[in-house]
């Protein structure tokens, strides 16, 4: 018999049985092909509150579950099921949570110590790619698989980044990202312009 859970009740979602390298809580957020559908299903306010609570809990352990404890904490950045999690807020009315948590992961998860750098799943350069893209303020939820890719905006760590574009795929020669007042603590975007046109909030 299969009985749907009442998601308003307290469910022990960190149990691993039935899940490979993750938990029910973590896999709940892994719907990269239909994030808006997931938000509608959960409800935006609950979506934001639950995800924020998961990040706050996992920040205490630097978003890192070592060894075989992949499902022990809500957000385990070193595993595929959670690498997109910080950018899920970009699909809500409060995208600044993306900027906060993506920057927190860069500051706390990555580093030079034995628990830092690549303690997680570095398949095909995944960890380093996430860091590089996030540090220039970009991310793709679908991992570059879409015919018409959508780039999500994070918080650049550099005041200027210049990317040479391959004319086989792009009409322009380069993409230049400029950010004002860049600092370690200043991670919140106030406005964005693309080709001198102001973009909407999300």
Tell me the role of every PLM-derived stretch:
Residues 1-11:
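Single conserved hydrophobic/aromatic residue that forms the stacking wall/gate
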Residues 1-3, 28, 182:
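Short, flexible, glycine/charge-rich loop motifs used to bind or transfer phosphoryl groups or to couple energy/partner
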Residues 9-42, 75-76:
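Extended ligand-binding clefts on enzyme/binding-domain cores
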Residues 12-21, 32, 65-70, 81-82, ...:
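Flexible glycine/proline-enriched surface loops and loop-helix/loop-strand junctions
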Residues 10, 41, 45, 52-63, ...:
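Non-catalytic C-terminal accessory modules of carbohydrate-active enzymes
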Residues 33, 47-50:
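N-terminal hydrophobic targeting segments
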Residues 1, 23, 73, 120:
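Conserved short-loop catalytic and cofactor-binding motifs
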């Amino acid at each position: 018999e299969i009985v749907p859970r009442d998601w308003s009740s307290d469910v022990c979602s960190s149990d691993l049985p039935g899940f490979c390298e993750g938990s029910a809580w973590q896999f709940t957020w892994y719907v990269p092909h239909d994030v808006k559908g997931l938000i509608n299903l959960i409800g935006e306010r609950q979506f934001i509150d639950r995800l924020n609570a998961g990040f706050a809990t996992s920040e205490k352990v630097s978003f890192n579950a070592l060894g075989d404890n992949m499902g022990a904490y809500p957000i385990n950045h070193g595993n595929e099921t959670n690498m997109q999690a910080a950018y899920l807020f970009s699909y809500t009315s409060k995208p600044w949570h993306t900027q906060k948590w993506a920057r927190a992961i860069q500051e706390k998860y990555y580093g030079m110590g034995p628990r830092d750098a690549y303690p997680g799943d570095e398949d095909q350069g995944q960890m380093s790619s996430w860091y590089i893209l996030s540090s220039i303020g970009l991310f793709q939820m679908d991992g570059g698989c879409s015919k018409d890719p959508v780039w999500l905006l994070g918080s650049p760590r550099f005041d200027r980044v210049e990317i040479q574009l391959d004319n086989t795929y792009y009409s322009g020669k380069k993409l230049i990202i400029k950010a004002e007042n860049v600092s370690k603590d200043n991670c919140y975007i106030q406005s964005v312009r693309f080709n001198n046109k102001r973009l909407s909030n999300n």
